[in-house]
Design a protein with these regions (language model features):
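The feature captures the catalytic groove of carbohydrate-active enzymes
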Residues: 1-4, 9-17, 114-151, 158-197
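Acidic/polar, glycine-enriched structural segments that form the non-catalytic walls/loops
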Residues: 1-76, 142-150, 154-162
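Alpha-helical support elements that line or immediately flank enzyme active sites
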Residues: 74-110
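Generic structural signal for well-ordered, non-membrane alpha-helices
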Residues: 18-19, 105, 109, 130
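A short secondary-structure junction motif
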Residues: 58-62, 107-114, 163, 167
């Protein structure tokens, strides 16, 4: 055998349980786990079901708090920019409006520093307005949304006034200027030889 290969001759009617693990388990317990998972798995009949299932897989539960998983294993869960970009699609348009506020509230609680003070994702806090507009467009009561999130929105906008953030501020003409020595400040955050592209 070659490392990484598993070969088994089977005939019609055979049933095999294969598990690769660092701990030994009985085949019966593995089969029970598989059958329990298979029973809970959604019934997928087409592309729309598959998209909804994939969207559901990106919403995770961390210590009882729902968050959006950004990039599966290679990025953290609950990242500011990634959550604000994807929250409407993964909740509102996927038929899960009840998750929108819970995920957004968790994001606000976890990302206060980056929302109101400093971040290398200088445009990300402003995406909060887009997310809330999407929420209202999907049927949320504008007055309730304003009552709940107006303080957050005002703090975000005020943080862009001169002196509010080290890396970005509003200029006299109303435009935003972002600059910090040797630091990438937008979604284009690639570096070459230690210098942002």
């Amino acid at each position: 055998m070659v490392p990484g290969d598993f070969v088994l001759k089977m005939k019609q009617g055979d049933s095999v349980v294969f598990s690769a693990s660092t701990k030994e388990q009985s085949p019966a317990s593995i089969r029970r786990k598989f059958n329990a998972y298979a029973a809970e798995a959604p019934h997928i009949t087409g592309l729309e079901d598959q998209l909804k299932h994939c969207a559901d897989s990106l919403i995770s539960n961390h210590n009882g708090r729902k968050m959006i998983c950004a990039g599966l294993s290679w990025l953290k869960t609950g990242l500011l920019r990634e959550t604000l970009f994807s929250i409407a699609g993964l909740t509102l348009y996927a038929g899960r409006p009840e998750d929108f506020e819970e995920i957004l509230d968790n994001l606000i609680a976890n990302e206060e520093d980056r929302l109101f003070t400093k971040t290398t994702q200088v445009e990300a806090p402003l995406l909060m307005t887009v997310a809330l507009q999407d929420y209202i467009s999907s049927g949320a009561d504008p007055k309730k949304v304003w009552n709940k999130y107006s303080t957050t929105l005002k703090k975000i906008l005020e943080s862009y006034l001169p002196g509010g953030r080290e890396e970005i501020s509003m200029q006299p003409d109303g435009l935003l200027w972002a600059q910090k020595y040797r630091t990438a400040l937008t979604w284009m955050n690639a570096y070459v030889n230690g210098v942002p592209v």
